[in-house]
Amino acid sequence: MRVIVAEARVPFARDGAQLHAHSLVTQLRLRGHDAESVALPFHGRKDELLHEAAAWRMLNLSTSNARTVDVLIATRFPTWFARHPRKVVWLIHQHRAAYDLFGTPYSDFTDSEEDAQLRAQLTALDSKMFAECERIVTNARNTARRVQRFNGIAATPLYHPPPLAEQLRNGPYGDYILLVARLEPLKRVDLAINAMAHVDRSMRLVIVGDGSQRVALERLAAQSDAAARITFTGALWGSAVADLYAGARAVLYTPYDEDYGYVTLEAFLSGKPVITATDSGGPLEFVRDGVNGFVRAPHPEPVASAINRVAADQTLAERLGRDGQSAARAITWDGVIEQLLG
């Protein structure tokens, strides 16, 4: 089949959505399909959202170079606005600031009449575009619940392996807790930094990632009693990240209401337990408290108590990690491609 994967790309950012689209194109090609990614820049400013949706609507992707494109796979807002007779949505997320993040500190939408009208427009337009689609699946149950809640659409969750899957491996259970995330407010890296003041001094925190909050987070870490035990590596990719997963005692991942979250599965495929929060969303679809990790309230002391459990008991960390690894290995690309292409 000839397949286009539609991608709304944030310039100069390498986020989960971009990795998702790249992995999908790669896996389609490995299975003999002629697959390409089509991307338009996405900025996400309120005053640009309708213009960005209109730009996608102007695209007719049913043919390319005088040849038929069999399927268009849309991924995140506003890629499903593109025109194609056989459009499938593999929903990563909608424009969350107008939906589930509205009313939280993570949204730039206010209670103003103007913003209320824009939110209503976006909801109506999304619903109209979804009605054009042959099939709607999501990357996680959490995402499916949102589209059901806001648009009244039933969607099937479709899990897929993380991009690093082939490079991840078991390794020694070292003296550090690993945190891999973009340094943005939704990832709540400050929670991990504040927790370290309550963590046994034998444990370090290694933070992998970059983003708009890096300077503020480095300043927060420098002011902490645990400053000497907190390291920022910046953005790392490929084997460099896999090596850090392999050597960690456990992985800390406490975002706010994550859609899916590759980090959970990357940790499990490395045989490491995951510590997450009760409101972290996607990770809760995989992390079972006391079985393959810990689920704690999103506050420094409870998170620190979970870290201290694995710090004091390496055997426990190994047992939890083994359980997570077996579950993560059951997620494969073959089933994903079959469901997407029908």
Question: What are the roles of these predicted feature ranges?
Answer:
Residues 256:
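Aromatic "clamp/platform" in nucleotide-sugar-dependent glycosyltransferases that forms part
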Residues 289-301, 309-314:
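Conserved acidic donor-binding segment of nucleotide-sugar-dependent glycosyltransferases
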Residues 218-236:
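Nucleotide-activated donor-binding/catalytic signature segment of Leloir-type glycosyltransferases, i.e.
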Residues 235-236, 243-248:
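Short alpha-helical donor nucleotide-sugar binding micro-motif in glycosyltransferases
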Residues 168-187, 193-200, 206:
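Conserved donor-binding/catalytic core segment of Leloir-type glycosyltransferases
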Residues 107-108, 112-136, 144:
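Membrane-proximal helix-turn-helix segments that form the acceptor-binding/catalytic region
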Residues 273-277:
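Short hydrophobic beta-strand element within catalytic cores of glycosyltransferases
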Residues 309, 316-330:
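A short, well-ordered alpha-helix in the C-terminal region of glycosyltransferases
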